[in-house]
Amino acid sequence: MNTKHDTAAEHHAAKRHWLNSHEAGYHKAMGNRQVQMIAIGGAIGTGLFLGAGARLQMAGPALALVYLVCGIFSFFILRALGELVLHRPSSGSFVSYAREFLGEKAAYVAGWMYFVNWAMTGIVDITAVALYMHYWGAFGDVPQWVFALGALAIVGTMNMIGVKWFAEMEFWFALVKVLAIIAFLVVGTIFLGSGKPLDGNATGFHLITDNGGFFPHGLLPALVLVQGVVFAFASIELVGTAAGECKDPESMVPKAINSVIWRIGLFYVGSVVLLVLLLPWTAYQAGQSPFVTFFSKLGVPYIGSVMNIVVLTAALSSLNSGLYSTGRILRSMSMGGSAPKFMSKMSRHHVPYAGILATLAVYVVGVFLNYLVPSQVFEIVLNVASLGIIASWGFIVVCQMRLRKAIKEGKAAKVSFRMPGAPFTSWLTLLFLFSVLVLMAFDYPNGTYTIGSIPLLAVLLVAGWFGVRKRVHAIHSTAPTLRK
């Protein structure tokens, strides 16, 4: 019995050794401040700056509770990822962990679903950059494609010349977003404490009770909003990919992850609570940033331009992150056979340039298609991409559960950074992700069509697997550390 147990442990150790060999070539150049900002930057997107106005209209003050619930489960997902990172840091992130604990088929599904997500998100980000630039009249005559290609050229170049440049750019992008929220929190808190009226209304908690209470439209609209709000945290998993190029992931990653939960609480929940204490929630409108609404009431000049800079930065940050992560994920998939062989190539700057160039090519094609296809079709495709995020988060949690099983069986060493409350919180998080899919199905028409597309996605993935399985089997049969 012991011999069989020892053989299983040795085989798993050999598999980890083979997976670690996939990390060869990367330059571990990221410092603590960069990893910290990548973690929080991934949790703050344009959803807070632009989308909060429409969501306040839909749910009122209850939006704060929705952000809190989604933030808690985002934290659980990050802690699950952190446990995996401490087990084995990898630039392949959850794709590499899926390969280790679930097999190559799971790595194939996880990787391509994640790529589809970033491909669609990136196209939207590039288009958004062009639209944000047109906000300023001076650029009104410049064609949108010029700004789109310009943004691609800048972000693509930074990603190609080295991880240090990506990390530095992402640090400053994230810092702009953080400083914008801090500025609102400081000014808003001071104004609230002064007791002065704003736009003819006294500030304070009575603005909630006098306008329908905490759930002005009832519980159901707030519940349905969960399926939209959860995607505001759609880049949190980036810290797992970055861990493979950190100077000291064992100390940096836990610090970065643990800081996310209180920052989500402060930035998301704190901002919404402050917004509804300063003005009636009915004062915020869809299509306008609630922060612009507040500062406009104060008479602050050029606030529209300032906020446009912030959302422009957020779009560039997302584009930057997408290129970085897809380059690493595609290389990890290629090493296992789930992606074309050329995508495993590295440059002399320690960058997986082939995967990045492939993503850039998709972005360029997508930008031009965006101007040709109907907007509703494009919106549905983007919603389908959201399934990639749910799938990625699901794989992270399942891999964490399999890691615990491997530790229990003596196949893997214990890690110091463990997901709190597991396995209960692991199952609860999976249930939450499933509930998001159910809520999406009730969001007619786009959400319903998105869930309805799952069988089609499954057929495409199965067809793709038949296209790569010969190479997958060849790689796995010849890897010396995997032969029993």
What are these regions (language model features)?
Residues 1-53, 57-62, 74-79, 91, ...:
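Membrane-interface "cap" regions at the ends of multi-pass membrane proteins
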Residues 26-30, 50-147, 260-263, 269, ...:
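Extracellular loop-to-transmembrane helix junctions
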Residues 30-49, 151-154, 208-269, 274-275, ...:
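Hydrophobic, membrane-embedded alpha-helices of multi-pass small-molecule transporters
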Residues 90, 113-128, 233-246, 268, ...:
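Membrane-helix boundary/coupling elements in multi-pass transport proteins
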Residues 96-98, 103, 135-139, 208-212, ...:
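TM-loop-TM module centered on a large, flexible mid-protein loop between adjacent transmembrane helices
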Residues 144-202, 234, 257-261, 382-395, ...:
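Membrane-interface loop-to-helix entry segments
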Residues 180-184, 330, 383-413, 428-436, ...:
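Hydrophobic alpha-helical segments of multi-pass membrane transport proteins
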Residues 343-353, 393-444, 480-483:
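C-terminal membrane-solvent junction of multi-pass transporters and transport-like membrane proteins
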